[in-house]
């Protein structure tokens, strides 16, 4: 889907350099079709980088996707210019009376922070409660998965003693699931998290369908039977160099991190890594848009009355 974004958004030029089809609002306005309305709650500190990554994954299909960016943290950002936030982001109050076809909630570097100590935890709870009645399908990524499992299912925070970082192999567990349609039986995906997602825990606490997991028994991809919510515990949106940037940042901070697993050629941080997960990342988001959003959302969003009860 060509993504529909404001003409001045920096991602437009960035993605066009990669030959990614981005449709500006001015061009999209002359097409007489209803675009899918997708809201992205961006919790990452480097918001522009994260925008580029998610918009890239949402761009590869023939229908329009109208993107709106949401922020819920009113504190001054150290990583994103205030002008960018003011120009391209909305607050919850701006959209709380609207309905959306899809919602994506990104990860956040909060793996070692207790939920009640997260500055915007009440706002996260508010958005998830709102989404039950106002969004057709919501996709949670990495830390947002842990937050959603706690809010929606009461699952306690599970934290690993050591951060998992690297590119790990996973296998699909339901061969005919729509969200993994077109996937290889085994595939790679990057992870960067302290959160722990044992598949057994998900099965014990919920009726969610686990669609893919790691060889170590960690759930990677799972979803509700009604397609209203989906969870991906890794970072399929990451660029080839994102894990490297995190690793060298931690090295410079004196944290002595482990070299990301299965990432640098010959496990040598001086060598340039390559993205080995890109095709499955694209498939995941394309499948979510098609089967979890487009196929079940109403044409007239005013008539939507979904429920997770």
Curated annotation (Swiss-Prot):
Gene Ontology CC annotations of this record: cytoplasm
CDD domains membership: GATase1_HTS
UniProt keyword terms in alphabetical order: Acyltransferase, Amino-acid biosynthesis, Cytoplasm, Methionine biosynthesis, Transferase
Binding-site residues, substrate: 163, 192, 249
EC number(s) on file: 2.3.1.46
Entry's Gene Ontology BP terms: L-methionine biosynthetic process from homoserine via O-succinyl-L-homoserine and cystathionine
Gene Ontology MF terms in the entry: homoserine O-acetyltransferase activity; homoserine O-succinyltransferase activity
Sites marked Important for acyl-CoA specificity: 111
Cysteine disulfide links: none
Primary localization: cytoplasm
Known pathway: Amino-acid biosynthesis; L-methionine biosynthesis via de novo pathway; O-succinyl-L-homoserine from L-homoserine: step 1/1
Localisation: Cytoplasm
InterPro entries in the cross-refs: Class_I_gatase-like (IPR029062), HST_MetA (IPR005697), MetA_family (IPR033752)
Keyword match DNA repair: no
Active site: 142 (acyl-thioester intermediate), 235 (proton acceptor), 237
Residues with site note (Important for substrate specificity): 192
EC category: transferase
Membership in a protein family: Belongs to the MetA family.
Described function: Transfers a succinyl group from succinyl-CoA to L-homoserine, forming succinyl-L-homoserine.
Name of the protein in its database record: Homoserine O-succinyltransferase
């Amino acid at each position: 889907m060509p993504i529909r974004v404001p003409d001045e958004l920096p991602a437009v030029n960035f993605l066009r350099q990669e030959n990614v089809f981005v449709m500006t609002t001015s061009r999209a306005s002359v097409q007489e079709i209803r675009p899918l309305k997708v809201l992205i709650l961006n919790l990452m500190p480097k918001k522009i980088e994260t925008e580029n990554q998610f918009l890239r994954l949402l761009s590869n299909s023939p229908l329009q996707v109208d993107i709106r960016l949401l922020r819920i943290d009113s504190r001054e950002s150290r990583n994103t210019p205030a002008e960018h936030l003011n120009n391209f982001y909305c607050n919850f109050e701006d959209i709380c009376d609207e309905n959306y076809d899809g919602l994506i909630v990104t990860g956040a570097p909060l793996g070692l922070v207790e939920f009640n100590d997260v500055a915007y935890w009440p706002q996260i709870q508010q958005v998830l409660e709102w989404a039950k009645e106002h969004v057709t399908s919501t996709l949670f990524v990495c830390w947002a998965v842990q937050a959603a499992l706690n809010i929606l299912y009461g699952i306690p925070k599970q934290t690993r003693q050591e951060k998992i970082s690297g590119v790990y192999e996973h296998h699909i567990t339901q061969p005919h699931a729509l969200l993994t349609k077109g996937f290889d039986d085994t595939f790679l995906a990057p992870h960067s998290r302290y959160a722990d997602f044992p598949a057994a825990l998900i099965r014990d606490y919920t009726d969610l369908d686990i669609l893919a997991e790691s060889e170590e028994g960690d759930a990677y991809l799972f979803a509700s039977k009604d397609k209203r919510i989906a969870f991906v515990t890794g970072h399929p949106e990451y660029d080839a160099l994102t894990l490297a940037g995190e690793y060298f940042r931690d090295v410079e901070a004196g944290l002595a991190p482990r070299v990301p697993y299965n990432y640098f050629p010959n496990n040598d941080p001086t060598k340039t890594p390559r993205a080995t997960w890109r095709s499955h990342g694209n498939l995941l988001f394309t499948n979510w848009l098609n089967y979890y959003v487009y196929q079940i959302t109403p044409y007239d969003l005013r008539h939507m009355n979904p429920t997770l009860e």
